[in-house]
């Protein structure tokens, strides 16, 4: 290998062209950048990057090939009060690294939040970037492009979903390979979901605090390398990318979309006591929101916040999204703590990153889902994201639970949430699909735990049960914990059925948490982010198959109702919806606000949802015509008057 040629400022990262590798690094405040390459024995050789175009440093290393391990040392001022923490003694990870060798350890040589620079070299313990080739044969792969009105999302963890599945080959359980295995594809099709939403698959690290307690970060919301697949779920780091793409291709062949949960709000460098391994040493001032005293704005609760209003960081974020789309053919993204994306530092719908996504012909055409809050002032932004974003609807989650469990919600409020929360999302030209309705998600109680626990039980997390929300709107039905007498178990079953039916028969885009369809419990832990064990792994052998069948029937029913699949707002007299009382008459103003929680919802003039959220069996009168109960609900073939137990029943006009 020779000295570096000047190379090109694009594409960003390390790019192999068949003859050598072009390297680039964004740093607006650096004074010098060294590329450091390592041989198989760990010997280091350094090269100055000779080119600079704007704020991008670049150079070309002829003869370099995939498999080369590298990093950067970045020279510049050490001025913590101004947000500058350059220290060439620290080897830094390429923010665009496609593969990483080594884990991020809790090691004093990696800590960079000191008042004075630590000049001890950290190359022996620092993770290294690895050059790869992106080539892959996609054959005839085509994106399913499921319309929002037909979309049913299934949120799952790569490992937890399949690690205990007895029908999968032992060696692929809990891996990317398992996602595309015929056993899993057949299950997804039988269930009826149209999109698999994966918790973060970009490489992440366990926080130093967890490492000291002997725990690990399981969920993955502590990003280390945003362009690299987490290697633990692959046969080897070298094969991770192809194994993931094989799974995407298999899922696409079955008509199932793949959505990635992506963390563009903070990095695993955490606060000033956290490790320095990349962005902090490359250009702290540009990559993060810095306070006047040089510390970080912590709008994420994770110690730092990415400055997604800076042009260089906006470009980084957009290239990250395009990489996953173009290299891995993913169909969309769910953005963690997405209000950070709109901070300038106040939240704006025309924030630079939003504008860049809207203007991008690639990014603006896929499914984009925001978790529409962060923990900073003004961070709660439900309903305020611009098109083409959809949003997690916590109004729906809380209302559904309050209606069926504590039973302290009006019929009017329930109906509003059932109708895709038009008061929140019917603006800026958005359709009902912008409301992503959920009962549960990875954070919080599972659905079974919602009906078994009144209090969280997070002691295993090592924080004396202080972590996790206390606002669960749950109901243990008279006994804390799993198990109980038959009548209690039946009441819990009825509540689960009512909640699932509400989720899957409401207007908007439903999201189902993996495991809720077969009764998975985390034993009351509502923040199992550090539990990589049987608490979070789905136990397929103990699955409630009756509940799975019930859920699948609901999804099939949903796809038959035009009022739900049309993805257009319901208007008075359009034939999509009528709201009736138990006597099949229009609900009065008093019944909306003060009446018993009894109602009938007529959809598309031929599907009737009879709802009884009281504790009494109630006679209801169905509208004129011949009606029959439809799967998964039992009932008479053509009743005119019927008794509805606590829960709901669906009828179809004959």
Swiss-Prot record:
Which biological pathway? Glycan degradation; glycogen degradation
Asked if the record carries the keyword Nucleus, the reply is no
Per the record, a Pfam family?
CBM_48
Superkingdom of source: Bacteria
Q: Which intervals of the chain are annotated as region Disordered?
A: 459-484
Record keywords? Carbohydrate metabolism, Glycogen metabolism, Glycosidase, Hydrolase
| UniProt-listed Enzyme Commission number(s) | 3.2.1.196
Reaction catalysed by this enzyme: Hydrolysis of (1->6)-alpha-D-glucosidic linkages to branches with degrees of polymerization of three or four glucose residues in limit dextrin
Sequence intervals crossing the membrane: none
Provide the active-site residues from the annotation: 336 (nucleophile), 371 (proton donor)
Gene3D superfamilies reported in the protein's UniProt record: Glycosidases, Golgi alpha-mannosidase II, Immunoglobulins
Which CDD domains does the entry mention?
AmyAc_Glg_debranch, E_set_GDE_Isoamylase_N
Gene Ontology molecular function: glycogen debranching enzyme activity; hydrolase activity, hydrolyzing O-glycosyl compounds
Q: Where is this site: Transition state stabilizer?
A: 443
- Is this entry keyworded Hydrolase? yes
Question: Which segments of the protein form a coiled coil according to its record?
Answer: none
Enzyme's top EC category: hydrolase
**Gene Ontology biological process:** glycogen catabolic process
Its biological purpose is as follows: Removes maltotriose and maltotetraose chains that are attached by 1,6-alpha-linkage to the limit dextrin main chain, generating a debranched limit dextrin.
Protein family: Belongs to the glycosyl hydrolase 13 family.
Q: Which HAMAP family match?
A: GlgX (MF_01248)
- Identification of the protein by name: Glycogen debranching enzyme
Source species of the chain = Salmonella typhi
Q: Which gene encodes it?
A: glgX
